[in-house]
Regions:
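A general secondary-structure boundary signal
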Residues: 32, 45, 52, 59-67, ...
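Outer-membrane beta-barrel pore domains
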Residues: 5, 36, 71, 119-122, ...
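Short linear Ser/Thr-Pro motifs
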Residues: 17-20, 257
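Solvent-exposed loop/turn segments connecting transmembrane beta-strands
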Residues: 168-177, 244-246, 275-283, 317-319, ...
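N-terminal periplasmic/intermembrane-space "pro-region" immediately following the signal or transit peptide
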Residues: 6-7, 12-13, 21-126, 461
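N-terminal secretory signal peptides that target proteins for export/translocation
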Residues: 1-2
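Outer membrane beta-barrel
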Residues: 95-124, 129-272, 280-287, 291-302, ...
């Protein structure tokens, strides 16, 4: 459009110029004759006009070519910018996905450790003499009793998963072990109904530990191993050990309300051998707990266990049913805690039936080969800021029939006392004295006692 206007303007300019020249010539000559343009002049003017039109056309072509080049350049720049932006967008998407995983995943750990001195004595007659054995080693040393590493991932508001490993080191045995203590998928459908599939906390022991508060100093009474004192092949569990499992493989249903007049419960159907043993058997075991809190600071709970503890296998020997009943009454507020736990068990060690005659625990019916009654009482008081004093006393009476069906007895007494200090929110230290004394079995007198003093600690993150 601009080139056409320019052509018209040039032509008009040339016409006006020619007309002015002719007018001037006419005026100077003062001749009234008519102005005429000869053919040569007209041809010259047409040639000039054609030349100007050619120049305008050439200029227009150059301008259009330049405009096309600018468009191509802009497109190329845009393509480069898009190409440069795409990796950034992909990286951003990957970072968003990673952030989502990180935000919904929690990694933590708990370590129980101690630096103590042990004095262990045992014997069958006379005064016990110093001797290493039954889980005790004389001398001074540092132990990492437990180290739990936990990964917890939340898929959504309902589903989550947990993996907890259990590492322990025993300096007396110079060995380490690593197990999967918890590995479960959880569906939380309501505060009163959560289900877990896999290895998870059992109903009783972890529940008592929360109210006790000093697990890093000592296991609760049903989780404590009573080493030594029993001999013979009737104890399939390898002697008098713990009377329960803190975790096992199976299906677990649990729920709770909060505040005053609240309830809590858990029912677990499990393999029966604990989290360290995935052994399959012909039947499953069950453990349950029900608790009631008239006020938030107090709980009254009962529990029970029944099963073969994984010993009922195909073409195996006949079995008995192991049972355990539990009761807990506890109180805990910001300054004071106290509790009493009681349990009664039958056939906990003697699952497999053995031939034998004579009197003894349930020998006439051939049903009960061992039974135990135990109780534990504890208290603690936070008397100043991070400082607290605590004490605990355990008593166990254990009876069993030996291979000739003669009843034998074991009596175990344990107590500890100490003072604890919360160094940090996640670091606790305690100066503790422990005493354990075992007597029996009476048919072949056997005794041992252990005194231990030192520091116990718990680090969590």
């Amino acid at each position: 459009m601009r080139s056409k206007l320019l052509t018209v303007a040039i032509a008009a300019g040339l016409g006006v110029t020619s007309f002015s020249a002719l007018a001037a010539t006419s005026k100077l000559s003062q001749q009234p004759a008519r102005v005429t343009v000869d053919a040569a002049t007209l041809q010259q003017l047409q040639a000039q006009l054609a030349a100007l039109q050619a120049q305008v056309a050439d200029l227009q072509a150059k301008q259009e070519a330049q405009a096309d080049a600018q468009v191509e350049t802009a497109k190329a720049v845009n393509d480069v910018q898009v190409a440069a932006t795409k990796p950034t967008e992909d990286l951003s998407k990957k970072l968003d996905a990673l952030n989502k995983i990180v935000d919904n995943t929690k990694i933590g750990g708990t370590m129980f450790f101690d630096a103590t001195n042990q004095d262990h004595k045992e014997g069958t007659t006379g005064s016990p003499a110093k001797k290493d054995g039954h889980g005790s080693t004389n001398g001074t040393g540092f132990d990492v009793k437990r180290f739990y590493l936990t990964v917890d991932h939340k898929f959504n508001d309902t589903w989550s998963a947990n993996l907890t490993t259990d590492f322990s080191y025993q300096s007396s045995l110079s060995s380490t072990s690593l197990f999967v203590k918890k590995a479960y998928v959880q569906g939380k459908f309501d505060p009163l109904f959560t289900v877990r599939f896999g290895a998870a906390d059992m109903p009783w022991i972890p529940f008592v530990e929360k109210w006790y508060g000093y697990r890093y100093v000592e296991n609760t009474i049903t989780d404590r191993s009573f080493e030594g004192g029993r001999s013979g092949g009737t104890a399939t569990a390898g002697g008098v050990g713990a009377f329960g499992n803190s975790s096992d493989w199976g299906v677990h249903a649990l729920g709770a309300t909060t505040g005053d007049n609240s309830i809590n419960y858990q029912v677990s159907v499990v393999n029966g051998r604990g989290y360290r043993n995935l052994r399959r058997s012909k039947s499953v075991d069950s453990e349950a707990r029900f608790g009631y809190s008239p006020i938030e600071q107090m709980v009254i709970a009962v529990g029970g266990y029944s099963g073969k503890r994984g010993n009922d296998v195909e073409n195996g020997p006949a079995t008995r049913t192991a049972t355990r009943g539990d009761v807990l009454v506890a109180w805990r507020d910001s300054n004071f805690g106290a509790g009493v736990e009681y349990f009664h068990s039958q056939n906990w060690d003697d699952i497999l039936k053995y031939a034998g005659t004579g009197q003894g625990v349930g020998a006439a019916l051939g049903t009960t080969k061992d039974k135990a009654d135990g109780y534990s009482a504890w208290a603690d008081w936070h008397f100043y800021d991070q400082w607290a004093v605590f004490a605990r006393y355990d008593n166990l009476d254990y009876k069993y029939n030996n291979l000739v069906q003669v009843e034998e007895k074991i009596k175990d007494k344990y107590y500890n006392a100490g003072v604890s200090y919360d160094v940090l929110k996640n670091l606790k230290l305690a100066l503790v004295y422990k005493h354990n004394k075992l007597d029996g079995p009476y048919a072949t007198p056997y005794h041992y006692k252990t005194n231990e003093v030192g520091f116990w600690g718990m680090l969590s993150f």
